[in-house]
C-alpha cells in the first residue's frame, strides 16, 4: 500500500511479510516463547534466561545513566513512564520482560503456573476496591498513614480495607514500611494522581470485569456469539436482547464519562499516538486537489485536527452521534486555519453515508467494535456515497498469524480480542479477516493490504472503491 509512508528512521511492516525487521522479531519471539527453543535441560534454560536478564538490564541501565535519565524503581518518586527509547534499548526492555516472565513460569512449574493463573482475577478485585473507594488519594504522598486512621476516612471495615491493601502490595501497589502503616509506591502514587488512569481501572474493574465473568453463560446460550446484545456485558447488567454496551453506558453520564476518560488513558499509552498515522499516511494527492476526508465515528475530531495541521488545503468532516457532536468543543481548534476546514456532522454509521464523493472515508477504533455482520453493514452503508478511487481506511489492530507477532505485543492484542468478545461479541482481526469484510460488503472494494509503522501497535488497513 503505497499511501503509507515511513521516514527513513522508521520502517513499516506488512503483516505476514518477511522483512529483516520481521525476521529479527520472529527470532526474538522464538527465543522467548515457552517450548519454542529447547535446551539440554531446565537448568540450562534457566541460566540462559538469567544471563539475558542480566545483560539486557545492564544495557538499559547504562543508557539511562549516560543520558541523565532517572533510573526506574518502585519508590514513590520514581518516573511515571519510560521516555522514548532508541530501538535497541526498547528491545532490551522487551527481552528483560519476556525472559523474566518465562523464568517465573519455569521456576514456578507447570502445575503451579496454571493453578495461580486462574487467580489473576483477584488482582482486579483488590484494585477495584482500592479505586472505587478512592483509597490511593487518601494516603499522603510524603509520609505513611496509620491503617486505623486511613480506615476512619472510608466506609470500609478494617478487615476489608487491610485485605485489599495487602493484596495490592503483592503487586507492588502500596507498601507497609512498618506494621500497621501504609505508604505509597510509584504505582499507587500515580493511581492517586492520574484521573484518566482511575477511569481506566474503574471501567475495567466495574464494567468489563463483570462482563468477562458472564462470557461463559453468553456462549452457552448463544454459541454463534454475533449479536452485540447477547455478550457477556449484557448478561452482567441484565440487558440481554435489549441494547449493546454503548447504549447502556450512554444512559449513565458518569459511566459514559468514565469510559471516555479510560479510552483517553489507553490511547495515550505506548504505541498509540495519533502521530503514527498523521506522520506516515500519505494524503498529498488529496491535499493537492483540496479533497475531503470523512472521519466516521470521529468523536470530537482529534484525528482530523492533527491531520489538518499537516495538510493545509484539505477539508475534513467529522461524523458521530448527535450527543457526541453537540458536546464537541467550539471552536474545534484554536488555530483558525485548522478550525475553518473541519466541520462536524451528526451521523449514525449504521445508516447510509450522507457525504457523497469524498476522497477518504476513515474509521479509527470503530470496526473492531463489531462482529462481522455489523462490520459488513457499516462498509455497505458507504457504497452510495463512493466515487471511483475513493479510499476506505481503517486504523485498528491487525493481529498477525499466531506466533509471528512481537511477543511484547502479543499479550496485549490477545487481551483486546478477549475483551471485545466479552463486551460486544466483537473481535480483533487478522489481515485475511479484513479482506473478507470488504469482499462480503461488495466485490467492487479492492483490498490494498495492511501496513504497520515500526513501534506502533495499530495498523492501517485500506481498500479502494473500483466501480
Swiss-Prot record:
Record's note on what induces expression: Expression is specifically induced by several chlorophenols, especially if they contained three or more chlorine atoms in their structures, such as 2,4,6-trichlorophenol.
Residue sites binding S-adenosyl-L-methionine per the record: 320
Biotechnology remark: Chloroanisoles such as 2,4,6-trichloroanisole (TCA) are known compounds which are usually associated with wine faults. They belong to the family of haloanisoles which are key substances responsible for cork taint in wines.
GO molecular function, one term: chlorophenol O-methyltransferase activity
Entry keyword annotation includes Methyltransferase: yes
Keywords attached to this entry: Methyltransferase, S-adenosyl-L-methionine, Transferase
Role of this protein: Chlorophenol O-methyltransferase that methylates chlorophenols into chloroanisoles which are thought to be responsible for cork taint of wines. The only single chlorophenol (CP) methylated is 2-CP; neither 3-CP nor 4-CP are effective substrates. Within the dichlorophenols (DCPs), 2,4-DCP supports the highest rate of O-methylation, and the activity decreases in the following order: 2,3-DCP, 2,5-DCP, 2,6-DCP, and 3,4-DCP.
Name of the protein in question: Chlorophenol O-methyltransferase
Organism: Trichoderma longibrachiatum
Lineage of the organism: Eukaryota, Fungi, Dikarya, Ascomycota, Pezizomycotina
